[in-house]
Amino acid sequence: MAKVQYWGTGRRKEAVARVRLVPGEGNIIINNRSFEDFFPNQTSRLIVQQPLVLTAMQGRFDIICRVNGGGVSGQAGAIQLGIARALLKANPDIKAMLRRSGFLTRDPRMKERKKYGLHKARKAPQYSKR
């Protein structure tokens, strides 16, 4: 008999995370690497674990993630959203709690495109009056 597993997809900036929750003892594997190896800084680790801490499900599921694109912050945000969506499938009763804390909301902020005639998206060349 196959194990029960719950899927969730999260996106943030350019990062896309596919998250799988399997009943277990709380191990987190990201791109076949341990959680601590993948996110050496504490801030990213806290971001990823927030939905689990809020719902008190830290030791109930093993989390297996595939994440690509973006940088460290974007990947952490994408995994957070993926975990929240997968937890919602596992237990629909926690929807109000996750929604109130903002874990089910996709952050729409993206990098603004560079415009021609400018150095960056908004940085203009130095202006000389004379």
UniProtKB/Swiss-Prot annotation:
Keyword Oxidoreductase: no
Compositional bias per record (Basic residues), positions renumbered to this chain: 111-130
Keyword tRNA-binding assigned: no
Region feature (Disordered): 105-130
BP terms from Gene Ontology: translation
Disulfide bond annotation, renumbered to this chain: none
Any GO molecular function: structural constituent of ribosome
UniProt-listed SUPFAM superfamilies: Ribosomal protein S5 domain 2-like
Keywords on record: Ribonucleoprotein, Ribosomal protein
Protein origin, superkingdom: Bacteria
Gene3D superfamilies for the chain: 3.30.230.10
Annotated Gene Ontology cellular component terms: cytosolic small ribosomal subunit
Family to which the UniProt record says this protein belongs: Belongs to the universal ribosomal protein uS9 family.
Stated name of the protein: Small ribosomal subunit protein uS9
Organism: Syntrophomonas wolfei subsp. wolfei (strain DSM 2245B / Goettingen)
Gene responsible for this protein: rpsI
